[in-house]
């Protein structure tokens, strides 16, 4: 990070960290990724894990709220508001496939994945839940990052099945993504506004974004 800033002062270094950036440990050593020591921000894999667990019914809205608040409390604001919020990548199954199949962990072998068939009913479930996941992705602080093809409902389990040729399939989901991106680009409160998380019932998560006295978090 120091070397990058010497040459490119306004460049941002985003790290591939799969856990909480402020508490990450590996090989018995606590990593100094946050507080300006190593990274400007990171890929937000924990968001993907918790969103899918919530939408698949593996955790409650209260659990999801607790996770979101923990990130908000643990991360310095510049890092928090620059998180790369992703739902899919080349290292994990596509979000629509995860939500359609319910396979968030314990995936079958590569041979079994190659033969796996997602039915129309499963796909419709995945479609509906993916749109909810994307709503969370766009409404929490950070930078929404869409893995190519997710905007058109592409499927894929683990590599290489999540790296398929791009095709325009689900136009409804594409239009929903256009609405979300337009809304976020238009409303500054979704970019740098304050965030408040609530769980009024066991299944309902509420995300409130607001600006206080005409000032955002910065």
Task: Put a short name on every predicted segment.
Residues 1-83, 136, 153-179, 187, ...:
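Active-site-proximal helices and loops of the catalytic beta/alpha 8
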Residues 14-15, 144-148, 188-194:
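Acidic/polar loop patches that form or flank catalytic/metal-binding clefts of enzymes
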Residues 68-158, 205:
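Substrate-binding clefts and catalytic carboxylate motifs of secreted carbohydrate-active enzymes
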Residues 94, 141, 184-191:
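Alpha-helix capping/termination and helix-coil
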Residues 194-198, 202-203:
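Short, solvent-exposed loop/turn elements at beta->coil junctions and helix N-caps
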Residues 215-218:
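Short, well-ordered beta-strand segments enriched in hydrophobic/aromatic residues
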């Amino acid at each position: 990070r120091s070397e990058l800033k010497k040459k490119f002062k306004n460049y941002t270094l985003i790290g591939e960290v799969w856990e909480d950036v402020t508490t990450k440990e590996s090989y018995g050593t606590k990593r100094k990724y946050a507080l300006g020591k190593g990274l400007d921000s990171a890929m937000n894999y924990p968001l993907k894990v918790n969103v899918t667990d919530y939408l698949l019914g593996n955790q409650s809205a209260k659990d999801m709220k607790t996770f979101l608040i923990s990130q908000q409390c643990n991360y310095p604001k510049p890092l928090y508001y620059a998180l790369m919020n992703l739902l899919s990548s080349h290292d994990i199954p596509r979000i629509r496939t995860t939500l359609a199949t319910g396979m968030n962990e314990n995936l079958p072998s590569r041979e079994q994945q190659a033969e796996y068939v997602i039915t129309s009913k499963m796909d419709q479930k995945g479609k509906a839940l993916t749109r909810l996941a994307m709503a969370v992705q766009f409404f929490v602080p950070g930078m929404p990052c869409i893995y190519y093809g997710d905007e058109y409902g592409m499927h894929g389990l683990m590599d290489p099945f999540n790296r398929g040729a791009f095709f325009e399939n689900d136009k409804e989901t594409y239009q929903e993504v256009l609405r979300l991106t337009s809304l976020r680009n238009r409303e500054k409160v979704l970019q740098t506004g304050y965030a408040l998380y609530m769980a009024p019932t066991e299944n309902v998560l509420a995300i409130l974004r607001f600006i206080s006295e005409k000032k955002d978090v910065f």
